C-alpha cells in the first residue's frame, strides 16, 4: 500500500520543536531568534512566499523583520542593507527572497551574507561544507534538507545499497540534494536536460527526486515498483474544469498514475513545500543557538536529521 507523505504534518512536528527551542534560547540568553527577510519588487508569488515565511517565524516566537524594497532598489542600496544586518547581533538569519529584479546581481548579494547568517544555505562556504561531508557546522539549503527528512523517515539514516536519482542539477536544489544522499551512502545519479533515456535510468532507482519544473514529466512506466518518490516541482497548469482562466498546482510527477506503483510519494501541494519553510525556521534557530555558543535540543536535532 502506498504511503502518501503528509508534508504539513511532518512540518508541524518540526515547527513545534523549533518553537520550544526558541523558548529555551530566550530563557537561557534573554534573546529570541532574529530573522530578517528581504524582498525587492512586487512579484505576487514572491510576496506570497515571504508572507508565509514571516507568519511562520512569528508563530515560532522569533523576532521577525521584513524589509520590503521597491523594484528600483540599486545594488548598492541592497548591499548596504545586507551589510547592516550582518552587523546586527539581534539578527541571526538573513533571507533574500529570490528571484531579484534583473538589474540586481543576486549571487553577489547572497555571497555578501555572513555564512553563519545564511539561513537559505546558499553561500559558497555552506555549500562547500556540505560538499565535503560537514553536516554539523554549516547551514544546509532548506528544500534539499526538507526532502531528506522524508527520505530518512522512509529508509532510515543509512541508504547503503539504494540507488537514488535526482532529476535536476541546479545549485539551489539538485546538487545539494545529491550531496545529502551521498553523505547517507546512497548510490546517486544526477539527471538533467542532456541526459539520454531518462526513463530507463529512472526505472533503476529506489529513490526518485524530481526538481526540473516540467509538469507531470515523470510517468508511472518510469518507476521501479516500490520506489520512494519525492516531488519538488511546483507548476501551474490550466484547469478548465474549475472555470475559465483557472489553474491548478501540479508537480513534476504525474501523481495520480504514479502513486499506485510507489511505496511512498509526496503530493503537490502539501508535500515538500511546507518542509522548505520548516527547515528555514530550523536553520534560523540553529544559527541563533550557535551565536550564543549553544546547541539546539536533541529533540529538534533528531527530527531534522533522523
From Swiss-Prot:
Q: Name one GO cellular component term.
A: cytosol
Q: Which residues form a coiled coil?
A: none
Q: Which GO terms describe its molecular function?
A: methenyltetrahydrofolate cyclohydrolase activity; methylenetetrahydrofolate dehydrogenase (NADP+) activity
Listed under catalytic activity are: (6R)-5,10-methylene-5,6,7,8-tetrahydrofolate + NADP(+) = (6R)-5,10-methenyltetrahydrofolate + NADPH; (6R)-5,10-methenyltetrahydrofolate + H2O = (6R)-10-formyltetrahydrofolate + H(+)
Q: Which residues are noted in the entry as NADP(+)-binding?
A: 168-170, 193, 234
Give the InterPro entries listed for this entry.
Aminoacid_DH-like_N_sf, NAD(P)-bd_dom_sf, THF_DH/CycHdrlase, THF_DH/CycHdrlase_cat_dom, THF_DH/CycHdrlase_CS, THF_DH/CycHdrlase_NAD-bd_dom
Record keyword Hydrolase present: yes
Q: In which pathway does it act?
A: One-carbon metabolism; tetrahydrofolate interconversion
Q: What does the UniProt keyword field contain?
A: Amino-acid biosynthesis, Histidine biosynthesis, Hydrolase, Methionine biosynthesis, Multifunctional enzyme, NADP, One-carbon metabolism, Oxidoreductase, Purine biosynthesis
Which BP terms in the Gene Ontology apply to this protein?
L-histidine biosynthetic process; methionine biosynthetic process; purine nucleotide biosynthetic process; tetrahydrofolate interconversion
EC number in record: 1.5.1.5, 3.5.4.9
| Keyword Electron transport in record | no
PANTHER family in the record, alphabetically?
C-1-TETRAHYDROFOLATE SYNTHASE, CYTOPLASMIC (PTHR48099:SF5), C-1-TETRAHYDROFOLATE SYNTHASE, CYTOPLASMIC-RELATED (PTHR48099)
Family under the similarity heading: Belongs to the tetrahydrofolate dehydrogenase/cyclohydrolase family.
Function of the protein: Catalyzes the oxidation of 5,10-methylenetetrahydrofolate to 5,10-methenyltetrahydrofolate and then the hydrolysis of 5,10-methenyltetrahydrofolate to 10-formyltetrahydrofolate.
Oligomer status and interactors: Homodimer.
The identity of this protein, by name, is: Bifunctional protein FolD 1
Which gene is annotated as encoding this protein in its UniProt record?
folD1
